[in-house]
Amino acid sequence: MQHTIQSILTQDAARLTTALALDPSGARIEVQCLLQHVLKTSRAWLLAHPERCLSDSEQTHYAALLQRRLRGEPIAYMLVSQFAT
């Protein structure tokens, strides 16, 4: 099943809000950050292309990151470059 950026933002922000007791706007920003990381793009691009569907590999990568976040792992730990010093 193909998921659009818009559907992911709506559904997964609600999941984060419930699971981690985040405010809805904070949860939406976190989902945007995960999508930006997976798609290697900017927030502006995400907002301009809500109809874009994730490929299977993008969806798999995103789902893995989301599960880590739902378990409470800080988003900064997931998004930091492995080459950061």
Predicted regions and their residues:
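Conserved AdoMet
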Residues: 33-85
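Hydrophobic alpha-helical packing segments in soluble, helical-rich domains
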Residues: 23-37
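Non-catalytic nucleic-acid substrate-recognition regions in nucleic-acid-modifying enzymes
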Residues: 1-27
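Amphipathic alpha-helical recognition patches that constitute DNA-binding helices
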Residues: 4, 30, 61
